[in-house]
Amino acid sequence: MGGLRPWSRYGLLVVAHLLALGLGAVVFQALEGPPACRLQAELRAELAAFQAEHRACLPPGALEELLGTALATQAHGVSTLGNSSEGRTWDLPSALLFAASILTTTGYGHMAPLSPGGKAFCMVYAALGLPASLALVATLRHCLLPVLSRPRAWVAVHWQLSPARAALLQAVALGLLVASSFVLLPALVLWGLQGDCSLLGAVYFCFSSLSTIGLEDLLPGRGRSLHPVIYHLGQLALLGYLLLGLLAMLLAVETFSELPQVRAMGKFFRPSGPVTAEDQGGILGQDELALSTLPPAAPASGQAPAC
């Protein structure tokens, strides 16, 4: 496959992506289609039974109209049931969480601007805030990646590992640390606090939040009639978890993307040409920088010099 032209490699990549897209659609249709049809049939049966029982005092179409209004309101993030104090969706902690979901492109939940002014401000806020967020992320990446390269360099020196093996070891360790600290542990806490949430649902919520998928209508504490102070503190804690977790996930992904094995896969789709200094840089350059900051290992006293 090394003799393929660049346009052939790009075409192969596009075809592989389309095949993966189609495979995902088929699998999701097979898994989610039958449960959705089953729930729809159950809802229709319940609706028909309710209409038959209250036909004398219920005008035709009144129940469907009421349910349509309630569902449309719920789809915009406005609670129609439960405690009225909890139903205030646009309080300050919830608004902070919504603003963070815009700047981090997470966008989970049902909150959405309803007024024309809110929609216009959301577009302007995102247009100005997203570039600023990207600049902040780039700055944090530039500051934190050299710090992460120092343990890798220490391991390479003291364990006599090559830079590539030390980088792979650090990437695996960092991935496990992020997965346990920002996915599994918060999922266990959410599973214990949120009574109506399964462990798989809690793991899915944490993963979808940190991966910016955001396809989740679960918001911790919503619908449990909590004290307003506890509920607001929970929203602020969720905001802090989202920001810190996204930063940790970004560093883990960046560490994996700088592995020589991953960079070699990327070079397959680049135009063939001489190897540039940029291609030779990356993680090995960070190792050299980190090695230069380490003090030289002093030989042990009384130890014979190695031949």
UniProtKB/Swiss-Prot annotation:
Do you know which SUPFAM superfamilies this protein is assigned to? Answer: Voltage-gated potassium channels
Signal peptide span: none
Please indicate the ranges of residues that lie on the Cytoplasmic side. 1-10, 141-170, 254-307
Q: Where is it chiefly localized?
A: membrane
Q: In the record, what terms sit under GO molecular function?
A: outward rectifier potassium channel activity; potassium channel activity; potassium ion leak channel activity
Q: Please give, as recorded in its UniProt entry, the membrane topology of this protein.
A: Multi-pass membrane protein
Q: Cellular component per GO?
A: monoatomic ion channel complex; plasma membrane
GO BP terms: potassium ion transmembrane transport; potassium ion transport
Q: Which residues lie within the membrane without crossing it?
A: 92-119, 199-227
Q: Which Pfam families does the record cross-reference, listed alphabetically?
A: Ion_trans_2
Q: Does the keyword Ion transport apply?
A: yes
Q: Does the keyword Kinase apply?
A: no
Location in the cell: Membrane
TM spans (from-to)? 11-31, 120-140, 171-191, 233-253
Q: Which UniProt keywords apply?
A: Glycoprotein, Ion channel, Ion transport, Membrane, Potassium, Potassium channel, Potassium transport, Transmembrane, Transmembrane helix, Transport, Voltage-gated channel
**Family in the record:** Belongs to the two pore domain potassium channel (TC 1.A.1.8) family.
What's this chain's function? Probable potassium channel subunit. No channel activity observed in vitro as protein remains in the endoplasmic reticulum. May need to associate with an as yet unknown partner in order to reach the plasma membrane.
| Full protein name | Potassium channel subfamily K member 7
Source organism per UniProt: Homo sapiens
State the gene name recorded for this protein. Answer: KCNK7
